[in-house]
Amino acid sequence: MSLMSVGRMMAFVFAFVAIVLWGCAECKECTNNNAQSHTHRYQILTSSNESWNIISHYKLAPKDDHDHVLADLLPRKLLKEEHQHDWDVIMRKTEKVSVLKAPHQRQDFLKEVSLHDVRLHEGSIHGRAQQTNLEYLLMLDVDRLLWSFRKTAGLPTPGTPYGGWEDPKIELRGHFVGHYLSASALMWASTHNDILKKQMTAVVANLSICQEKIGTGYLSAFPSEFFDRFEATEHVWAPYYTIHKILAGLLDQHSIAKNPQALNMVKWMVDYFFNRVQNVITKFSISRHYQSLNEETGGMNDVLYKLYSITGDQRHLLLAHLFDKPCFLGLLAVKANDIANFHANTHIPVVVGSQMRYEVTGDPLYKEIGTFFMDIVNSSHTYATGGTSVDEFWSDPKRIGDTLESTDNEESCTTYNMLKVSRHLFRWTKKVSYADYYERALTNGVLSIQRGTEPGVMIYMLPQGRGVSKAKASLGWGTKFDSFWCCYGTGIESFSKLGDSIYFEEGGKNPTLYIIQYISSFFNWKSGQIIVNQTVVPAVSWDPFLRVTFTFSLAKKTGALSTLNFRLPTWTHKDGAKGVLNNESLSLPTPGKFLSITRKWNAGDKLSLQFPITLRTEAIKDDRSQYASIQAILYGPYLLAGHTTGDWDIKAAPNASIEDWITPIPASYNSQLFYFSQAFANSTYVFTNSKHPLAMQKLPVPGTDLALHATFRVIQGKSSTNCTTLTDAIGKTIMLEPFDHPGMRVIHQGREHPLTVVGSSSGGPSCAFVVVPGLDGRKETISLESKSHNGCFVHSGLHSGRGVKLSCNSSSDATFKESASFIAKRGISKYDPISFVAKGVNKNFLLEPLLAFRDESYTAYFNIKG
């Protein structure tokens, strides 16, 4: 062999090895490039640590270097032709796609009804949540929302920017504005609030000015250089995530708010990004594009399929396909239960987009993907709330028992997106199980994230462990103008569309309506020519039935023949279920099916439904033996959490029914709740059971642990008092039961010893006190005299700096009289209408719906043995 031949051979070997090594360096990953939570990435961006400068320039997959290696080995023309070939093949495949009718035109899917035709009842639980959200949306300032968009476009920036994730230093800025566009469109449809309409129209108009100023179709709150980094697989925080929110918001402004300007803006934006993606594929490869999707891209495929269903533009369909993340959807396509360690809220929107692909193209593979995904999440990764994820990621299948150790369970965004998944599946299949899931996740995972009726106060995570608190998760409650987390964006959307999944229509010869959620509301059903008024009696624990009444009025002089289908939830049972139409009893199907009524509805028709609400336990999704006893307690769709700082042990007798160890709290008990206060040093103090023994603390705000500890149920002998004030109980003997320790009693331990709390069976005469007029002589005060120690009174010790005790000081001592006199007022805390007592091993537990908790500590799962 000649030296020349040897040289050629060696060159070939080196080239071959180089290509192999290049391929190894390119070994594919399917995940997030940056395996970090959003909260961690926000902390990096706001850190002053210089190490961020290193990270920010780190190439997560330094493909340019490998491309240079390949370019040195292969002719440039061949490379260019190969990548151009990739693009040409993609184009040809898209042109061959058989596209069905637009989703709203398809007869095989249930159709959404317009939010413009649905109105929630004011004062209902859902109506209050919607109103709280409306108040927040009206607080938001147009100039502050637009600040970073104007800055990016080189326009004047009046006002000051918002903080949190909308801060000008944060790479995800602008995402909340996209959510605002969607939320305001949905809220306007739900309320027709004129002020909101004016504000959201102004935001769209000014965003259009920004887009025109940039001049390329690009529109965002950050510069397009972020996409240079994205396409180079350099570190950048999810620019397409924000673009998806803006596109989706503008599309909602077009579709829901009927703003024609918004659609033109969307199409121009998509033209810009179509060209960017095409350039990446032709310059590098289709593989390079898919590698970049390992950074979070939100629901880009979803919004692009929706856009295509409006425009019919083949480029929109192609671009949607290119955001279907094949390495993730492929796992689901082959039915691999292998989603562990994926960032949940990165990938659920990809599934939602694949569901839209099915609706647009009819490809059954994508129906199977959505169905399988819902099955594995529900069977392996879901908490009793219906939510999923821990620290923003999925754990191993059926291994969520040890995730209770974290306070960062159930990212709120994931619940928002899982509701979309289940909604699609219900519309395709009409299966009650999907409607039941929707009810559970909406009730526990959405209604739980507002802090009562405080506008703009929401949470990121919903802890599921022992002794946890919404206020004490890693981020706790957000603030109105300095949080703007991803979950604020999905939150304002969720509370703007509470009426969008109550009613669904079905095409066919006769108009058909499915009522799948029992939420007090009016619905103007135009196809059926009737107005439906649904009134739900709020659920209570002492009367375990869901009661719903439907009344009807005619939209025209005569009604049309139509069919109404009413969901029978799987959490009820047939015994005790009733249906009455105009005083005539109906035969009901078994739970998990629909009651179907076909008739010509008339004004004055009345349908009443009654479903028993069952108490039940549900095992945690963990098949390891050490977690076999860990269970949640549910009442219908409501997850019941216990007021406890960590105790969770319950022992039920063998073969005992759940009603044997869980009992409802009667309605009358709220009238028996009081707190006891004194004024001292220009402050109001109350005696509390925050720790044993009892102590005086400053008057707490409602919704806190201290508010619970300061509230006591006044028990009068074996009965209870229903006095308006305790001055009405003068001369009567009472006992005090701590609000969050049902079955326990406040007792004294003898003269000059502190008061403490024991079980009711251990109290004896030490737990009895006589209500007497206040020793300080004021008509509004009372004193509590020991039944067993005449002349000895409950004494605050404020003046002496000591705890609450039984004191027998001289009756002539003015300071003593003042310290033994209290103003008794209605309890700071009160029992939720759905409240139970569960018998525990060490203590009894007060159970209430998770949605009722604000800052209080709670336990969502219990260790139930027996």
Each PLM stretch: what is its role?
Residues 7-27:
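Cleavable N-terminal signal peptides of Sec/SRP-targeted secreted and luminal proteins
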Residues 232-234, 283-290, 333-341, 400-409, ...:
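Active-site-adjacent structural elements in folded domains
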Residues 264-360:
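Hydrophobic, small-residue-rich alpha-helical packing segments that form membrane-like cores
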Residues 563-568, 675-676, 735-737:
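Aromatic-lined ligand-binding clefts that engage carbohydrates, nucleic acids, or primary amines
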Residues 680-698, 738-755, 788-800:
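A structural signal for the beta-strand cores of small, secreted beta-rich domains
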